[in-house]
Amino acid sequence: MKRIVMIAAVGILMLPSPGNASPLADRVLKGKAISSDNMKGNCLACHAIQGAEMPGNLGPPLLQMKLRYPKRKVLHDQIWDATKKNPQSIMPPFGKHGILTDEEVNLVVDYMYSL
C-alpha cells in the first residue's frame, strides 16, 4: 500500500504546474504578438487570420499552415524573403530587410503552425 501511495505522489509531483505555460505555448504567444505588431510582422495588414479583427485580404488567409508548409524551413524562408521565390511578391522580405530577426521569424513560424 505504501508503494502505491509513493508512486502516486511521485506521479502528481511530475505533473506540470497549471500556472506555467509550456515553452512552445510561450513561443506561440510571442509569435502572435510579433505578427500583430505594426512595427514588426503586421501580418493582419495583408492576411486574414481566424478570430482576428479587421484582417487584410491582399495575401492568402493564414490557416492550416502545417498542411500548406509541412517543412518549417520553407515557411521560414517565405517570411524571411518572399521575393527569393517570387521576385514580384508584394510581401516584404522581413528578415532580409532587418524588420525581423531570425529568432522573431522562428517565433512567427511557431505561431503560424498553431493556426
Locations of regions flagged by a protein language model:
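Bacterial N-terminal signal peptides that target proteins for export
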Residues: M1-M6
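Electrostatic cytochrome c docking/interface patches
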Residues: G19-N38
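C-type cytochrome heme c attachment motif
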Residues: S36-A48, P61, I90-P92, N106-D110
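Gly/Gly-Pro-rich "capping" loops immediately C-terminal to redox-active cysteine motifs
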Residues: L44-W80
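Axial heme c-ligation environment in periplasmic c-type cytochrome domains
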Residues: G56-M65, W80-L107
